[in-house]
Amino acid sequence: MRSWMLAVVVLFAVPCIASGASKDPAKLVATHGYAYMSFSKGGQDVLVVSPVGSRREIRIDLAADVPPVAKMQAIGDWLPAGSYRVTGWGPLTWKDGPTFEIKPGRVTDLGDYVGVDVGGYKTVMLPIAHPDRQEAVAAASRSFASTLVDPAPIPAGSMALSPAMERPGINTGLGLVADLLIAHDRKINKPSTLNALLAAKDPDAFLGLVRTVTLPTQEEPASLPDGTLYFPADFGQLRKRSPDGHWSNVGMDTLRQITAVEAHDGRLLTGSDDGHIRESRDGGTTWNEVAALGSKQSVLDIDHADGYWLVTTLENTDPFKEGAIRVPSPLAVFPIVPRTVRLRILMARQADLADLKLAREFAMDINEMWAWPGPQSQLVNGQYYVLAGNTPQRLDLASGQWKAIPPRARTSTLRVNPRTGVVSALWGQGAFSKVYYSNDQGDTWQQIGRPPYVIWDLQMDTATSGWASRWNVNAFSGVWELYSFSPKKNDWDHVGDAPFNCKPLRVSAEVPVLCMSRDSSIFSLRDGKWNVEFSAQ
């Protein structure tokens, strides 16, 4: 309950970002220039700049009209001619930020940055050089290009790593007691700082280090016959785990987040959050693009069996007004504008995916989706299972028929054991949580006892054995607990705890339970003891 309250407190504490008034470029070009900046992996909704030598703050919070790419945020605004310095990114103070010049009737490109969490509640802004940057800047100014004195943008100055920016504590607005609770929680749960990242001064060296410590972003890896696992990760990486627990990296020429991976017949296929599918036939040394599905379609799953390729993508369609960042109401718990999430399942028979086509689309209202973890797609015994919102769906590959297989009105998580075919479903709702399993591919369900809440993951391996993790909330912190199903008691036994600030991840019954720490270290559970497999320190 306390974690839910904490989430509500944080939600209400998020500052409201006002959209700037629309401006007529034709009336401004004589005295103003346009400043453009982008953040490849999302932003803070506002860039704060100040005239050089002045403490006056100017907020740039208008969305630039550029082609959408996954979570990228692009902003720009008209500023009076003069010299400026970037002084803030949302609530973060950007010390010694980059300086730039604004000239009448010109566009100034401030560059592209990625905010990187380096631990200890600190963020470093990493400048990124893109080969197609000029095209993005041109797109941002296309609507008013005819009014410009010179269409060539003024390039960004020296783009350097920012100093580590301290993320401030939350001012809840709910009084002193609430603020003290949040501050204490923040203090005792402070993650370790990645000192190697803080020591890096060169952007290329910093990026190289970031790629080596990025954690898996998906729970389903690609598995080789010898037990080697490939996990999707951020910054164009796959985290490779050998059977003996050694971790290394396989990378490709992209900074996007890799969100899916599959291994088949000596090939590795990956999907990214900007809709690209790539393949490697040499273990990840070289990569070729197989398909481009659209820059707003995240590829969340790639599966193969019996001559079928299945690809699951997710696309958000938001009624977003071009030229302004949508501002949530401070009194609304849910988004004030309905958002439709389109989950698409694509199918192909050819190895090169040339015949990839839509098999099914689910249009889901995000306001009706409760704690959705993603589609959790799995291909097992000729059946493709997908959690579409809160409803489990199953595709029979042989017949091409879809069937909804809900054990109840809503489902929070869906798991299928690839060896036994047992399906498990969880509805997480505190004391009202429900657990079900099925031995017949979801046609019928049996309800069993549940672990203590808050339940995060639950996997039944057979009708009489299973594993679960829960977040046990203490007074000012919490611990991840592990549970094993006891059929005699129809209940769950507490069998251990995860290390501090470490989230458990279970691939299967055949792989040791892993744990991903907030400082990017990785542990494994062997013979009841946690062992360090990868240290980011």
Could you describe each region identified by the protein language model?
Residues 320-321, 325-327, 335-341, 387, ...:
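Short, solvent-exposed loop/turn segments at conserved positions within beta-propeller repeat blades
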Residues 80-91:
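A short, solvent-exposed beta-strand micro-motif common in secreted/extracellular proteins
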Residues 226-230, 266-269, 307-311, 381-385, ...:
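Entry beta-strands of beta-propeller and related beta-repeat scaffolds
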Residues 19-64, 89-212, 219-223, 291, ...:
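Primarily secretory-pathway and cell-envelope proteins
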Residues 240-242, 280-281, 346-351, 394-396, ...:
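Conserved Ser/Thr-centered positions that define the repeating blades of beta-propeller domains
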